[in-house]
Amino acid sequence: MRLSRYFLPVLKETPSDAEIVSHQLMLRAGMIKQEAAGIYAWLPLGHRVLRKIEQIVREEQDRAGAVELLMPTIQSADLWRESGRYDDYGDEMLRITDRHDRDMLFGPTNEEMITDIFRSYCKSYKDVPKLLYHIQWKFRDERRPRFGVMRGREFLMKDAYSFDVDEAAARRSYNRMFVAYLNTFARLGLKAVPMQADTGPIGGDLSHEFIVLAETGESEVFCHADLVEMGAPGLDVDFDGDLQPLVDQRTALYAATEEMHQPEEFAAVPADRQLSARGIEVGHIFNFGTKYSEPMKATVQHQDGQPRPVHMGSYGVGVSRLLGAIIEAHHDEKGCIWPESVAPFGAGIINMRVGDEACDAACETAYQGLVKAGLDPLYDDTDSRAGAKFATADLIGLPYQLVVGPRGLKEGKIELKVRRTGETHEMSPEDAVSRLAEGAFSDV
């Protein structure tokens, strides 16, 4: 992509109403534009990152054996009355009436609808287990939206739901999502700690939140410090095997959100390993048994011929919130430092003297080489000042920046800057392209 053709409305000043770093940088880098309280338009740069995050979430759901579908955003109130949650959910639910005076709602979550879908088609124990997910925009009318996409009213969510014949099978589905989430967040460059959590209005008796530690986190969390450095299970996990040991390894040490915190248990953690910090919730999983299947009569016939309610679980990831969490974890005073897996562009080319025949030719050659290598470069072919070009490249987080100027080209060299470390290397344009293509400076 050539910057002269791209839509990148960067801001020179930080908006005064942006309280946290991720909100500030997303506005300054031209990633989002606020349209109403807690509601944002996703501009091209932000949309590119969002789609990359979404794709990683999708790939890890697929790897774990989940099957994607898509449910509508507008739901019938009748389903929520059937489960008993229509009157209980509160003012966060946006309730609407259609032209026929039928009560509808903009879905804040999908337990009722997915249960209705399941019960319409699955009648036998042979029809389970099932693990279904979708990625869709949600709306919750937050009383006080703040922190940009971290606590907005409209947000992109991945919701997965499991259906199993009994509690033991439901726990196996829970473990699948537990492990899938660890791998997902690791691929996004995040160290997410699973913590015992309150089930809230979703219900159930087993729940974990996945927390990324950050000073701007919405709540206080408590954990054994070893959990922060514990690596992800890895992409070669056998999801059809016994995952309980992997889950046990990551739940044996103390970790709890503020609501579930037990001070006496935390005191038993060695003093030098006690960690109390602020945290950002990026995922939440629940095992809620027959809370929805029983009132909604989602049953399957067992081998003894008797119908029984299926055991269910719910597994959510805030896809749009993840973008903010990644920035909170990866930034400096100059701007975003994206993990390569979600960087909006694979590299940047900065032409220091547009119109100079040698510079233009070298940039064009490098651009075509990076495109051929699949690195999706952003070529700054504008006539902006050099300082402004460097500032923009750092602000939006171009992971590798090829700086092409007439002085270096006289010696057949350009400068390659690694955004993550600040290191610079001088080499020929051809070497720069080939080394980037082979991942010589990769953070993976």
Swiss-Prot record:
The keyword Transcription does not apply. InterPro entries: aa-tRNA-synt_IIb, aa-tRNA-synth_II, aa-tRNA-synth_II/BPL/LPL, Anticodon-bd, Anticodon-bd_dom_sf, Pro-tRNA-ligase_IIa, Pro-tRNA-synth_IIa_bac-type, Pro-tRNA_synthetase. One of its GO terms (cellular component) is cytosol. It holds the Pfam family tRNA-synt_2b. It comes from the Bacteria. GO terms for molecular function: ATP binding; proline-tRNA ligase activity. Its EC number is 6.1.1.15. Signal peptide: none annotated. GO terms for biological process: prolyl-tRNA aminoacylation. It catalyses: tRNA(Pro) + L-proline + ATP = L-prolyl-tRNA(Pro) + AMP + diphosphate. It is found in: Cytoplasm. It is an enzyme of class 6 (ligase). SUPFAM superfamilies: Class II aaRS ABD-related (SSF52954), Class II aaRS and biotin synthetases (SSF55681). Belongs to the class-II aminoacyl-tRNA synthetase family. ProS type 2 subfamily. Catalyzes the attachment of proline to tRNA(Pro) in a two-step reaction: proline is first activated by ATP to form Pro-AMP and then transferred to the acceptor end of tRNA(Pro). Homodimer. This is Proline--tRNA ligase. It comes from Maricaulis maris (strain MCS10).
